[in-house]
Regions:
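Glycine-rich beta-strand-turn "strand-cap" elements at beta-sheet edges
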Residues: 60, 109-110
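Generic short beta-strand
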Residues: 10, 90-93, 108
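Hydrophobic beta-sheet segments that form the core/acyl-binding groove
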Residues: 58-96
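A structural microfeature
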Residues: 102-104, 120
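Residue-level signal for glycine
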Residues: 98-100
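Hot-dog-fold acyl-thioester-processing enzymes
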Residues: 1-56, 112-139
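Residue-level preference for beta-strand/loop junctions
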Residues: 4, 51-53, 69, 85, ...
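Conserved GNAT-family N-acetyltransferase fold
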Residues: 28, 91, 104
Length: 139
């Protein structure tokens, strides 16, 4: 499991003065892609013409988060389905107090960027994912 700290900016704040529905998902995906750049998977996705595609996301909102608040982003790749073309990912956003603010559980698959079809990912991509985030059960 990998994590990073994020300071919430005004672009994620809704009319209620807290991070809104779209804001939480944007924070999570922005941090996810930044993390992918840091570990080199963004380039690997392009080199190997295979990248993740999300089919569904379930978001549980547990605590309010406000502008300028520091939160911690954590990502886990959960035990994959038997079909190796698919994946399950959990993203957690924690308040600085340690309280869980948001849980995002997503299901997706690996997408061949040339054929535009679902595929089994190359071993090189899976080795990077196994090294950087893995958890054996959904919490």
């Amino acid at each position: 499991m990998k994590s990073k700290k994020i300071v919430v900016t005004s672009k994620y704040i809704d009319q209620n003065g807290h991070v809104g529905e779209a804001g939480y998902l944007s924070i999570a995906i922005d941090a996810l892609w930044e993390f992918n750049r840091e570990i080199g998977t963004s380039q690997k996705f392009l080199q190997l013409s295979c990248a993740p595609v999300t089919f569904s996301s379930k978001i549980d909102y547990l605590k309010e988060v406000f502008e300028h608040e520091e939160i911690e982003f954590r990502i886990e790749r959960l035990t994959p389905p038997e079909d190796k073309r698919k994946w399950i990912r959990k993203i957690l956003l924690f308040k600085s107090s340690g309280e869980l603010a948001v849980r995002i559980l997503a299901n997706g698959a690996w997408f061949d960027l040339n054929s535009r079809k679902i595929t089994t990912p190359p071993n090189e991509i899976m080795e990077i994912f196994d090294k950087n985030f893995y958890d054996s059960e959904i919490k």
